[in-house]
Amino acid sequence: MMKDGLYDLFCESLESLALKPGQQLVAALGGGADSQTILDLLMRFRQQNPQYQYLAIHLDHSFHPSSADWSSTIEHAAKSYGVKTVFEPLNVPIENRQSKEAAGRESRYRRMAELTEDDAVLLLGQHRNDQIETFFLQLKRGSGPKGLSSMAAIQPWVGSRRLCRPLLSVSKEDILSYAQQQKLTWIEDDTNYDTRIERNFLRHKVVPLLEQRWPQFGNSVLRSAKLCAEQQQVMDELLQEKLYKAQKHKSHFPLSLLSEHSAAMQRALLRVWLQGQEYSLPSYEQLEQIRLQAQSATDDSQMQVQCDGYSVRYFQYALWCDNNTGQLPADCWLAEANVNLGEWGTLSVPDALLTNNNELRLTFSLTSEKLAKPGRQGRKKLKDWLKQAGIPPWLRARRPILELNGKYVWVAGLGWFSYQVIEKTEFDSLQLPEPDWVSSGADSYRQL
C-alpha cells in the first residue's frame, strides 16, 4: 500500500467518527513502528484539520531495562511535530494470576482515560496481524462470538470516549513500508521475539506456518471475526430489547426473565445485563453459578457470587451488582458545605445547617433509636426505614447520614428526619433543600 493510500484510509476512519470542532484526538504511543505511524498520520491530518485538539501520550511502566531510554527517544520524536505531549512513568500493580502484560495494559488504559477529555478519541496502532493473533487467543480461551469478534475498529471506552484503530485492516509490512518512506524513528522491542509470550508464539510460530500452507488463511480469519461481530451485534440488540421491557430499574435483573427462558437464553440475558452495567464479563463457570443460585435465592439466602471487581447478589426478586471495594469514610465534623468522600462520592449540604453554632457530623453508623419522618405516622428504627425503602441489606450501612446537634436528621435515599432543634421549631418545617449525594459508583443503589 502506498503511503497516500494509508493516509486516505486513516482519514476515512476519522471521518466516520463524526467529530465535532474542539474534540480531542489522542495518539497512544508505545514506541513501535505502528504507533509512530499513527502519530505521523495524525499530524498530517492536523495540518488539514486544525479545528480539533491533538495530544500524544506515552506511559512507561518500566518493564524493560531500556524503557527510560526508549521514552526519551519517543518523546523527542513526538515533540518534533510540535504536538502537546504527556510522558509519564506508570506504576503497575500486578494481581495474583495476572500476567505482567495484562496488568500493564489495564494500567495504561486506566491512566489514559484520566489524562483525556470525556469525549476524546484514543487512536491505537493495532493492525491486521494483531487482529489475527487476537482471534487465535480468544479461540484458545474457548470464547463465543463476542470474543471471536476480536478487536473493533471503533468501540466505546470510558464515559463518552472512544477507541479507534484506523490500521486494523493494514498489514504490518505495509506499516513498516510507510514508516520507512516517512523516515520515522521507532523502537524495536526485543521482547517481541520471546515466544514464551503467547502472542509472540502465535506471531512467529503459528500464523506464518498456517499462511504458508493456506495463503488466504489470514483473510479468512478476519472474515470470521467480522461475521462473529455482526452476529453478536444482532444478538445484543434483541436481548437488550427483551431485558429493557422486563426491567423496572436499569441496575436490576428481574428473575422473571430466568423462569421464562432456556438455560442458554438465561446466560445470554445475564451477559447483556452485566455488560450494560459496564462490568467485566464473568467466566462461563461464574455465569453458571449466578444462574443456578438465582433460581433458588431468597432474601434470607444471602446469595453472593464473586466476579472480577464486583459481586452479584439477590434482593426482592432481582439480581444486583455490588462493586464495593473499600472501607467507608471515617465519621467527621462538617465545617464546609461540600465534602469529598473519596470513592464514595461527594456530599453537598445546605448552608443553613452550618449556621447558628450547629454541630454537624457525617457518619455511616446506623442508630438503634427510633426516628420519625415528616408526614409519616409512627417511629421506626433506621434499619426498618431502609428496609421499607427497598434498600438491600448490604447497602444499608453505606448511606451517608447527617447528625445535627447529636440527632440524626438526614439519610441518603430516605431524606429528612424530624425532631425539635432550634427554639422548639420542628426540623421538617425549616424546609431546607435536600443535601446532594453524588456517588462515585461504590454504591450500586445509585441508579434507582
UniProtKB/Swiss-Prot annotation:
Segments forming a coiled coil: none
Signal peptide: none
A single GO cellular-component term on record: cytoplasm
Domain of life, source organism: Bacteria
Enzyme class: ligase
Keyword annotations: ATP-binding, Cytoplasm, Ligase, Nucleotide-binding, tRNA processing
Gene3D superfamilies cross-referenced by the UniProt entry: 1.20.59.20, HUPs
GO molecular function: ATP binding; tRNA(Ile)-lysidine synthase activity
SMART domains: TilS_C
Catalytic activity: cytidine(34) in tRNA(Ile2) + L-lysine + ATP = lysidine(34) in tRNA(Ile2) + AMP + diphosphate + H(+)
GO BP of this protein: tRNA modification
Family designation: Belongs to the tRNA(Ile)-lysidine synthase family.
Comment block on domains: The N-terminal region contains the highly conserved SGGXDS motif, predicted to be a P-loop motif involved in ATP binding.
Protein's name according to its UniProt entry: tRNA(Ile)-lysidine synthase
Species assigned in the record: Idiomarina loihiensis (strain ATCC BAA-735 / DSM 15497 / L2-TR)
Lineage start: Bacteria, Pseudomonadati, Pseudomonadota, Gammaproteobacteria, Alteromonadales
Gene behind this protein: tilS
